[in-house]
Amino acid sequence: VLERSLSTFVDHPRIDGVWVVLDSADPRWDSNPYARNPKVYRAAGGAERCHSVLSALEALLVQAHPQDWVLVHDAARPCLRLEDLNRLIEELEQDPVGGLLAVPVRDTMKRGDPSGRVVATVERAHLWHAYTPQMFRLGALAGALREAIAGGDWVTDEASAMERLGHRPRLIEGHADNIKITRKADLPLAQFFLAQQGRLE
């Protein structure tokens, strides 16, 4: 899964480098073919997603400019389409804030209570599923994450950190097959989508 996700970014002509955030004791990374790729770097993971992302950004700030764009992507999303990645970059490279790939909500949404009872039906107009990659300026995103963590708000995506500071990230519509593999049952679905995209050998 990691190799599939990495290939999309490592092979992209407009991406200068890729930072992989892993547990410092991860035993499998050294056997990954990308471990020796000169375009790929490694950073230590943290307690939560926001800490891990900030770890990579802090390392990147040593060698990149704060105004450089960064893309943050879930390694568990190997089905990202190249066309979606290209659209994200092209649509946002002149944007003052940045943004993220997202998909409009099409299902009926319910809000529940702790006992599992419906409290309300949520109007789905203008609701979006937040996907990755999410694209922001390096310095701005690092600062937003530092501020969120210092405030005890362990945001679950980068856009949320930017929103806390009053920014309004742009939503770039992507494809719904950019799924996140979180359960074993997701693997066959990811394989199906990759086959449909012609990316399974």
Which sequence ranges carry the predicted segments?
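Hydrophobic helical membrane-anchoring modules
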Residues: 178-201
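Short aromatic/hydrophobic "clamp" motif used to bind/position activated sugar donors
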Residues: 70-71
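Conserved core of the sugar-phosphate nucleotidyltransferase
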Residues: 79-172, 201
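Short active-site oxyanion
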Residues: 15-18, 97, 177-178
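Glycine-rich beta-alpha junction loops
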Residues: 24, 104-107, 176, 185
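Conserved N-terminal catalytic core of the sugar/cofactor nucleotidyltransferase
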Residues: 2-67, 151
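Acidic metal-phosphate-binding loop of nucleotide-sugar-dependent transferases
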Residues: 49, 75-79
